[in-house]
């Protein structure tokens, strides 16, 4: 998860066993991405939108807000920027479904979405871009789960990457809990004539209020329900609790 799957990063880890060297390799890759973004969009907005992905996800907002990253842009230009980013294959787009059911594309909301980085190793480097390189100590704390940060968004990015690699399109769903808060299902999968809601946790925390409420409302539409967390496989009533490495098999 920390190294990612880019060949240059993997080779750097195998050759040096040093996360700082790995991070330098990943920064070179991201610099190439940035150069390509500038060819597509000389204004630099596409590059800024890409770099802002970790920050947008860490806010636990229900959508990516492009205007908070690049300021005021006319709607046609924003549509073009988003299309260019999606076509670049450097990001995985996850669209909101207004009515979660089989045929989720029918109620796909193209104005409400989240963006994930195509490679979680690159995502880690982007998240800690404020340093010249991400030091070994940060990687070690990430490995031991001792970094004082909410890492839920890292696991969301990882799950998004694995779901796309397994041939899934990405969808999510939110609905009001009260006047100020929302329930959220991180990912929705279509399986046969049913759907499978997926919730992602960054620890062994087993609470799943959103999952329970979603399945109560849409009980007739549910095939399986999954909570992805950092412990071993288990089952909590009707909910399958699975570690991230099992995601390709759901």
Locate each region found by the language model.
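Amphipathic alpha-helical segments of the small helical/lid subdomains adjacent to P-loop NTPase cores
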Residues: 1-5
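Domain-level recognition of nuclease-like catalytic cores that cleave nucleotide substrates
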Residues: 230-250
